[in-house]
């Protein structure tokens, strides 16, 4: 069985890139274009990992993270933040750890390596 990963990203080009990269690695990738849709998908089918943007319409990534931490079914789901919001990086690294925050543009090899470490690989 392949490992489910949820990509929550409002930029269609970044979302598509992440979906393509992760699918090519063998992950079962679901996507959401905003935080509200991402929370709904995570609640209905908890993933092994969420890749989360911070700046999104409707419900931003920080709020998504707070909601996940308040939900017993999602509290233990690991999150990797992928953001272009430079000023948010220190706080996110404090919360999630240095290795779980990537600034856009990100190094593909490093991000895929971290996803593999967190999930144990695609299968």
Per-region residue spans from a language model:
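Charged docking surfaces used in two-component/phosphorelay signaling
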Residues: 16-24
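Short hydrophobic/Thr-rich beta-strand motif most characteristic of the beta2 strand and flanking loop
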Residues: 26-33, 41
């Amino acid at each position: 069985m392949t490992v489910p990963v949820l990509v929550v990203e409002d930029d269609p080009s970044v979302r598509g890139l992440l979906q393509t990269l992760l699918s090519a690695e063998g992950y079962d990738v679901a996507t959401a274009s905003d935080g509200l849709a991402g929370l709904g998908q995570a609640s209905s089918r908890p993933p092994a990992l969420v890749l989360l943007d911070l700046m999104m319409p409707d419900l931003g990534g920080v709020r998504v993270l707070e909601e996940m931490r308040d939900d017993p079914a999602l509290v233990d789901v690991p999150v990797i933040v992928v953001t272009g919001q430079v000023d948010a990086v220190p706080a996110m690294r404090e919360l999630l750890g240095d290795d779980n925050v990537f600034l856009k543009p990100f190094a593909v090899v490093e991000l895929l390596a971290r996803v593999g470490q967190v999930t144990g690989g695609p299968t």
